[in-house]
């Protein structure tokens, strides 16, 4: 803390704020400086050394500090440190007098036939700190070496150079990042470096970074990178308690288990028992637990102790995805065997596979134990390919500047999904083909999900038939508010859990509300989301069609025509039913599959010859649908259509755009908004249950020729031509002049031949009736 007058200023020094590392070229004037001492250095690097965790952590922190001031995120620092470790240790030999040595020079006594540096201290204007002047010598003893990590030149632009830059005429893309001699790096330290890196990077990110480095530097450097990558993930021997302090492994794995514990949505006796047993195994049998937790995905262990009922509950509460197969002794990843059954978990949940093995007391037989590869000194020297800078430079195409910098970027904010619960729970699904938009509305969904039974004491076992071998519907509940139906499936091999089949309409919030209502009435302890949408029915209206009959009278893409007034087409192996007035139904699909079906069907509809859209009316009706997230009722649509038609006749066709702007303004301000819970336009039992059967049957009707007729007799989506045709043919028109003007306007403005012919027939009927 620094005092300034009466004020106190707290100065905190960041561990990444400054660095003691320096940069030095490894290739000068066509000379590879590392070639002569590489074998001796590799022998030194691979020998066994005492492991002091505090020293190792100090070294890796200094490697982190070399990232530079522009790198502000720890993940980016970790990636640069990882790349330096993957390129591995390197040494640059030199000769200097004793009075010129410093903390970066370590003693060495090997004779070098090739080039070495002769250095001496000098002050130069190119640097604010003392640097070395140098010259190249051959066939001379190297008195000292600079030791550090191989790096790329662009990573070290911010680091001070050991040599005077005035004398550096040219240099390679590779440089060495050297550290003080008390921070020497040995291969024994590599696995401990990984433990530090894993604080900021996942294993997948480490592998991805390794692949990116190999693809950048080319195949000639790949072998060097791969051997150091293997060193990160492998100990030379099983860790001894004398070498590795017990708290190191204990704290490391405990920290990871605490992270998993925090990801569990709900904690109860099942999750508590699971993690308590795992913690106990790690505490009491550390070596056994570490071996089990590090088990490869290729291993398929067999366990002897297993409880299926408890296992099913663990899968639900820990959200583990498991596939059950027969054990056919085939190659299978991420699995384990119990009896004749193979249980396979998802690749992203391999840690849970190993934790389950630990929970169920899995022990690897001696004859099946995997022999850990021992990284011997001779093996390391034989495998690692010394980096020949003359050859490796050719891996980069000429004229292409290599770029492997980590640019510090602000983390992107993850956008929330537009539809709560995902696209499968969307009330409206829209697709576009050119200027035509098709909106599909969900009429009902059927979903499956798992639940656990809370009161086993109230469950009567003898009610389940002894001969039952499959699940069946034990209970069925129908609710009015919110309107939904739940079927409960119970199986005789599982008395703790049940499967629910829910039939409901509405958004995801209504679904969650329905689950809460259901839980209040039955003995359910927990419901497990997400639910799986197994069936979904949707309805569509083609808006703005001048002649709606052409959709059902088409000849192409027709799959089946039923006796019922419905034409069946097929799109993406889904049957789409088309009724009168351009109304269609799409069963079974939801989400992306529904979008694909809509696009295919809309494309088929656009290919119908003689199909004409009134695009202004189409835009208005689509906007009203999207505003209310519901199909437009018959009365609302007719009010909008004939109001617009009257305005067009009053203003004249020349001011059509003015009328369109007026209608857009009225729709945007909610003049045509309607109640979505209207039962007059639905046949869904859930909706009828809201108001009761008698009131639900009270659909608005009109009297035509002394006969009651439902308003949607012509179809909910009927256009003006269909309504006028019905009125003219029924003869229930008192003021024929109004209808003649409407029909004449339609004939004048329509571009569809079928529409003009139909209007001409209707006008002929009206004029004939007027004469008679």
From Swiss-Prot:
Please report which protein family the annotation says this sequence is part of: Belongs to the herpesviridae UL87 family.
Name this protein carries in UniProt: Protein U58
Organism of provenance = Human herpesvirus 6B (strain Z29)
